């Protein structure tokens, strides 16, 4: 792992066109977050939900369930609807929802498996859209054919086929 990490850091230094290596350039390389998947801090999600008084939340790329955890921790929030293209996460979502529902029975949550841009995915009405789409070509969580990096192999195709359509689709559900 040390060699792989060193190679990724060298790649980041090269991408940033760093002329020298120091604390600041190393921090910049680490903060790119493009060499490892990162967690969206549930505490940050909670703070955002609270600040905006989010009641009906739609999460277009539910990820590891971090924003779901923030939803349950928020003093606001009545319903959460998430979608994710990684089939391997469904069991984890179900377990999270089951446990959180014991503590917060007044809140409802559902996470479905699928590609948000597909027409068969119907988004519920919401007052808050909150998501963290995968970095193009970097975050590769499974070989599932619904993964955006496999469906859209070029950045322009990914933007046109994935990112822009899910944004447009979700805006229509805002009430």
Predicted regions mapped to residue ranges:
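Helix-to-beta-strand junctions that scaffold the AdoMet/dcAdoMet cofactor pocket
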Residues: 173-175
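Long, hydrophobic/aromatic-enriched structural stretches that serve as scaffold segments
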Residues: 19-20, 33-46, 58, 62
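Soluble or luminal CAZymes and related metallo-dependent hydrolases
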Residues: 37-40, 92, 158-165
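Mobile active-site "lid"/loop adjacent to the S-adenosyl-L-methionine
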Residues: 116, 126-166
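Conserved S-adenosyl-L-methionine
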Residues: 45-119, 128, 169-170
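N-terminal accessory regions of S-adenosyl-L-methionine
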Residues: 1-38
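Short, contiguous strand/loop micro-motifs
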Residues: 32, 54-56, 154
